[in-house]
């Protein structure tokens, strides 16, 4: 019965988002179909985050599980039905005040996430300081960006063994210990405040609880009540530029409250992307997203994208691979001991390379085997043989000789060129 339930869960996982269009490949993709272990679409090879898959509840569960058994439990709520922790992200709805007139609709803007602060004017100013294409306004490019970063920065398979492929009991135990360790030592959530508010060290930090799941506020101005008493030159820990008076800053408790960042500077040290929902990992004086923090601690399989907890794994092409996952990216055949070619940083077996990726010889019009020599000029290729790399007029072999190129044609002399072109 347990096996049946596990198989059912696995099936449901692979059905999620099935058929969703790819936002990157458009009509070239037949629709999302999850590869059995690669975590990409079998049709177009793009990740699930590149497809138009509705993942709101799934992402809230993932972040909820991340915050479980941490000091950030105020940001989650457990469902009464199954006890699954759900992320209580703060949804902010801003209402622009308009003159009292008849038949005038109220202009509202909904942010799918906003910093959980009580001063909503401060939260609004925080949003204004982000690049417009990264502001998570519902239905916008920024909302799509946030969704993509949730998938990229916080992979479910970096924290939940059940999301991984065929872990041994020992690997499950190692992963659970690893997750517990980074929750205790590195995980944090940014806090938004005015720098001047931090002149006095807080004896009791303001609660991280975002309150109700949805918050409505009127647009107003940010008011810094303490700025009149004392003005300081505050500089961003990332860009070293000064903070403008009245502008909010982001703090990371694990970094210490003497450090703060512009909202747009609160980024991962490796990928330089905004830390999604201000969720960070602190290590050696640097901010990381979840993915790149884990990469700094454990090898990651370039095949399945999971962290490697086994003592035995393969290293090839400056990447790490589970032994069973060093496979052809096109056909999944094992490549150990086989000839392969790297295409876009992915290993391809020789038959698939010749069939799908090989360049075509302009001389014989056949695919060029990856193991044979070839001549390349601009975007044209030839076998480096007497039969293929020759003058288009007199058929003289041009290997080691000067030649005159005209598109895909080659000439040994001006005379041959004139004769052929006349």
UniProtKB/Swiss-Prot annotation:
Q: Which UniProt keywords are given for this protein, alphabetically ordered?
A: Cell junction, Cytoplasm, LIM domain, Metal-binding, Repeat, Zinc
Task: List GO terms (cellular component aspect).
Answer: cytoplasm; focal adhesion
Say yes or no: keyword Repeat present.
yes
Top-rank taxon of the source lineage equals Eukaryota
**Localization of this protein:** Cytoplasm; Cell junction, Focal adhesion
Which spans does this entry mark as compositional bias, Basic and acidic residues?
194-212
Which CDD domains does the record associate with it? LIM1_Testin, LIM2_Testin, LIM3_Testin, PET_testin
The PET domain, residue ranges: 92-199
Xref: Pfam families: LIM (PF00412), PET (PF06297)
Q: Where is this region: Disordered?
A: 135-162, 194-226
Task: Recall the GO molecular function terms of this protein's record.
Answer: zinc ion binding
Query: Its GO biological process terms?
Result: negative regulation of cell population proliferation
SUPFAM superfamilies assigned: Glucocorticoid receptor-like (DNA-binding domain)
Span of domain LIM zinc-binding: 234-297, 299-359, 362-422
Q: Which InterPro entries match?
A: LIM1_Testin (IPR034958), LIM2_Testin (IPR034959), LIM3_Testin (IPR034960), PET_domain (IPR010442), PET_testin (IPR033724), Pk/Esn/Tes (IPR047120), Znf_LIM (IPR001781)
Concerning PROSITE patterns, the annotation shows: LIM_DOMAIN_1, LIM_DOMAIN_2, PET
- Mainly resides where? cytoplasm
Q: How does it assemble?
A: Interacts via LIM domain 1 with ZYX. Interacts (via LIM domain 3) with ENAH and VASP. Interacts with ALKBH4, talin, actin, alpha-actinin, GRIP1 and PXN. Interacts (via LIM domain 2) with ACTL7A (via N-terminus). Heterodimer with ACTL7A; the heterodimer interacts with ENAH to form a heterotrimer.
Q: What role is this protein assigned?
A: Scaffold protein that may play a role in cell adhesion, cell spreading and in the reorganization of the actin cytoskeleton. Plays a role in the regulation of cell proliferation. May act as a tumor suppressor.
Identify its protein family: Belongs to the prickle / espinas / testin family.
What the entry says about domains is:
The N-terminal and the C-terminal halves of the protein can associate with each other, thereby hindering interactions with ZYX.
The protein's name is: Testin
Recall the taxonomic lineage recorded for the source organism. Eukaryota, Metazoa, Chordata, Craniata, Vertebrata
